[in-house]
Amino acid sequence: MNKISESSEPQVQRPRRLSRRDFLRLAGAAAAGLALARCTPSASPAAQLMETATATSVPSTATATTAASATPPPTSTAVPTSPPTATGVVPATATPSPAAVATAVPTAQPQAGGARSKVAIASIRDYDRARVRAAVQEMVDSLGGLGDVVRPGDRVAIKVNLTGGVGNKGPDGLSPMESFVTHPEVVRALGELVLDAGAGALFIVEAVYQWASYTEWGCEEVARHLGATLIDLNGTDPYPDYVHVAVPGGGEIYNEFIFNPILQEIDVFMSVAKMKCHWVAGVTHSLKNLIGLVPARFYRLTPEHSHRSAFHGPTDETAGQRVPRIIVELNKARPIHFALIDGIKTTEGGEGPWIRTFGPIAPGVLFAGKDPVATDAVATAAQGFDPTAPPMTVPFVRGLNHLALAAAAGLGTHRLEEIEVMGPSIEDVRRDFRPCVG
């Protein structure tokens, strides 16, 4: 297990940089794929995702700390006052650099020819290691395996949800892993299957509040077992600086995001989220999990804020308009290839103990899919909510429906009639959650 942190944590091993041979091989493959896509009438809109990134101008010898101070903060537009449209925003001002190799095109888009997106469900009562592994294996098998997602030698990143920091505790004596953060046994099970599929390198990533989140919440032990590298996305390690990654087609709030370069250099990106309600977004699953991709320091209204307050804006009203759009923009900039949602033991009424209505619930369920929008839609329905609900209605009581925005952006489908559920039905696993309305 390797540790890559914003802090001065010792580093056992750094991920390899692309060799010239690998660069040429991947560039050639990308060019061939583009040529093929141009010849195919039904090419997915996601083929344009992960556009060229531009590095900041910090010297290559800079440390993570100096890189952070030299990287210009991102700019965002004012909150739109009408439904989302493809309006222009302020162009990025980062210094241009040679084009980076694009990541693999997501396989999570609705299939052509009327085929429905598939989402797998598994009923499971606890986090017993063998049972979790068997459940995840069964779901992956029902989705056709990982062969169309992970290819031999691929570099794969798993984004976990470790929100809030270790000072926060679970309700009623439950651990955070059994309430508001991704359970490590779910990460372990998927990681083992990814390695079985031939992955050449595995990374577990999150913009953690502190490194202790990895240690105390089980990911450090899982990374050691898997031979994976842990990376704190708040910093630049193991690279000299951040990259600016464009939002394909532009965004309504942000035109680009500042990322740790690992998010661009990987071949496959997976989201392992917790099944929860959310104060601003209504629900938080695979798509919302990507809020934790960006370094918090660049997305604060004031330096004193510990969270990404610039995403929210000054009020709940602005947050309800901004955050759903930003969720979609992040998913366009860094698409998800495979989504897994931990709903075995979780919380209702809010995303964490800082929400007054937060409390425990044990649905005993897992969800998986290659269409992250569909996967989130099924999880939302299993919470007793309508994934197509209009803005300002339950569960999206404070703003826009980010599932609808994601579907409109071509990231997947949120309509249950367009989704084929594998395993138990939604009604079989449905457990009505208290929404975050207090």
Feature roles, as predicted:
Residues 1-18, 30:
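Secretory targeting signals
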Residues 2, 6, 24-27, 33, ...:
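N-terminal and secondary-structure boundary signal
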Residues 8-11, 24, 53:
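Intrinsically disordered, low-complexity regions of eukaryotic proteins
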Residues 21:
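Residues within the helices of the helix-turn-helix
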Residues 40-113:
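Ser/Thr-rich, Proline-interspersed low-complexity disordered segments
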